Amino acid sequence: MSINFIDFEQPIADIEAKIESLTSISSIDKTCDTNFNEEIKRLRDKSIELTRKIFAHLSAWQIAQLARHPCRPYMLDYVQYIFTDFDELAGDRAYADDKAIVGGLARINSRPVMIIGHQKGREIKEKIRRNFGMPAPEGYRKALRLMKMADRFSIPILTFIDTPGAYPGIGAEERGQSEAIATNLREMAYLRVPIVSTIIGEGGSGGALAIGVGDKVNMLKYSTYSVISPEGCASILWKSVDKAPLAAEAMGINAARLKKLKLIDSIIPEPLGGAHRDVAIMAASLKKQLLFDLSELDRMNEQELLDRRYNRIMKYGYC
């Protein structure tokens, strides 16, 4: 996956362009001396140092941009690295199969699990097929169908959240978007199996929460979780999307802020420069956290899980 640099990464992009140019010349001209190779090494060291410096002080808006990065790994990317024997299950058994929600049975270290998550799509045709990761009611009903199946067979549920929000189209509203989300919130609160939810990119509003009522809620370091997008908030409060950076800061959408407010349990570190820089390393960190969470939840009986989940939900809105 090639690196796409965001605006605030431009100084890094400039150095990487020089490295690419020198490397290209070096591969063509085999007579290049040691000084030439040393210059490439110096630039690589400088790029790493500059990346560390920039990423040590990211604003909430810059983190929002990283959460939306076009090369950021999506749920199905992680499935390849973390799970085996993935068997996708389709349809809500009522209306249609919403491709914005992907789910099915899989194994993590030979243990059966039900995995469910948003899928945005990468190329234009796939983005349209996946509706840019914005589920309609049938997507949430499919997710609930799979959760109830997992509950019936005592299989833990792992959800992966990455959506701008639930689809706000007329058809979705006519088919009961708000009802589907509300039903998921209610039903997830009473499932008798462990639920681990991880925000891997954007966690947008009710569209995220509809598969995010977990016993453990994690966030990748450069993911976001909010009731509305920074642009939406800025449009309402300041009547201008130009104020999105200010809105992002005010809403506290980043993992560190949400951990401080006790709305999430863990922050999963990302490779230097973001998850897209090294998907394998990111997947290994995510897998480690999932296994840790499952082992902790395994120690609880059914009633303890339900009580813990209920108490967690009731604390929302309190510092």
Swiss-Prot record:
One Pfam entry for this protein is ACCA
Quickly give the catalysed reaction: N(6)-carboxybiotinyl-L-lysyl-[protein] + acetyl-CoA = N(6)-biotinyl-L-lysyl-[protein] + malonyl-CoA
Report whether Glycoprotein shows up as a keyword of the record.
no
Q: Coiled-coil stretches, from where to where?
A: none
UniProt keyword terms in alphabetical order: ATP-binding, Cytoplasm, Fatty acid biosynthesis, Fatty acid metabolism, Lipid biosynthesis, Lipid metabolism, Nucleotide-binding, Transferase
GO CC, alphabetical: acetyl-CoA carboxylase complex
Write the Enzyme Commission number(s) for this entry.
Answer: 2.1.3.15
| Keyword ATP-binding included in the entry's annotation | yes
Q: Which cysteines are joined by disulfide bonds?
A: none
Q: In which pathway does it act?
A: Lipid metabolism; malonyl-CoA biosynthesis; malonyl-CoA from acetyl-CoA: step 1/1
**CoA carboxyltransferase C-terminal domain boundaries:** 43-296
**EC category:** transferase
Renumbered to this chain, the signal peptide range is none
Tell me which InterPro entries the record gives. Answer: Acetyl_CoA_COase_a_su, ClpP/crotonase-like_dom_sf, COA_CT_C
Where does this one sit in the cell? Cytoplasm
Any one GO molecular function term: acetyl-CoA carboxylase activity
Could you tell me the Gene Ontology terms of the biological process aspect for this record? Answer: fatty acid biosynthetic process; malonyl-CoA biosynthetic process
What family does this belong to? Belongs to the AccA family.
| Primary role | Component of the acetyl coenzyme A carboxylase (ACC) complex. First, biotin carboxylase catalyzes the carboxylation of biotin on its carrier protein (BCCP) and then the CO(2) group is transferred by the carboxyltransferase to acetyl-CoA to form malonyl-CoA.
Q: How does this chain assemble?
A: Acetyl-CoA carboxylase is a heterohexamer composed of biotin carboxyl carrier protein (AccB), biotin carboxylase (AccC) and two subunits each of ACCase subunit alpha (AccA) and ACCase subunit beta (AccD).
This chain belongs to the protein called Acetyl-coenzyme A carboxylase carboxyl transferase subunit alpha
- What is the native source organism of this protein? Baumannia cicadellinicola subsp. Homalodisca coagulata
What does UniProt list as this organism's lineage?
Bacteria, Pseudomonadati, Pseudomonadota, Gammaproteobacteria, Candidatus Palibaumannia
